[in-house]
């Protein structure tokens, strides 16, 4: 099997089979790019001054900011084993690596656009059912090169960016919020990160599909 290099954190390189790079798996740590506005999903220990007062979630243009890494996990109160391929239509959690809080939404109004607030919530990776997002994509699995949407499992809004920009103390960062309407503003794709190789489960399913 051909082997290709994969760029990981801080210039660390690994080698995995080319066919293993296509699906996104649980346990992977990734950056997510909003393809319409070219910003990466980001969080930090800065709280909203309005709404819920929880940790803010933004979009940043910087490629190398470590506060833009998110771990892909199973939905609340479940475990998705490392290397398990994420299916289209599957609910997941996205846990912010540096703060341990989960991507979250609720019926608060976002500060700039007046859409639905998106925050980071919980402690050490554990929050509540409002941390669950359903992966919307074409085909059986979420694939690395494919654009996906994230639909909040409880309120049905889509994770979105429409270009509103914050001032101090987070000058230049874009608001991330939830919107009911599907549009180009709510497409995302994986970029940099550590991608866990798919487990044997996927290989078994592919074999059966070919029989």
Model-derived regions: residue spans:
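Lectin-like carbohydrate-binding module/patch detector with strong preference for beta-trefoil
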Residues: 2-211
């Amino acid at each position: 099997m051909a082997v290709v290099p994969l760029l990981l954190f801080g210039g660390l390189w690994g080698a995995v089979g080319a066919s293993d790079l296509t699906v996104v798996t649980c346990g992977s740590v990734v950056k997510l790019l909003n393809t319409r506005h070219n910003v990466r999903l980001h969080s930090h220990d800065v709280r909203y001054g309005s709404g819920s007062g929880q940790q803010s979630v933004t979009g940043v243009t910087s490629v190398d900011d470590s506060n833009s890494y998110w771990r892909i996990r199973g939905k609340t109160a479940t475990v998705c084993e490392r290397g398990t391929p994420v299916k289209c239509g599957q609910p997941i959690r996205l846990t912010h690596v540096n703060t341990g809080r989960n991507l979250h939404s609720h019926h608060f109004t976002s500060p700039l656009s007046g859409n639905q607030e998106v925050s980071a919530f919980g402690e050490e990776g554990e929050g509540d059912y409002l941390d669950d997002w359903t992966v919307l994509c074409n085909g059986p699995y979420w694939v690395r090169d494919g654009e996906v949407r994230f639909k909040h499992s409880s309120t049905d809004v889509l994770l979105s960016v429409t270009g509103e920009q914050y001032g101090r103390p987070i000058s230049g960062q874009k608001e991330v919020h939830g919107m009911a309407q599907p549009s180009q503003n709510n497409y995302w794709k994986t970029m940099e990160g550590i991608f866990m190789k798919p487990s044997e489960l996927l290989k078994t399913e592919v074999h059966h599909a070919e029989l």
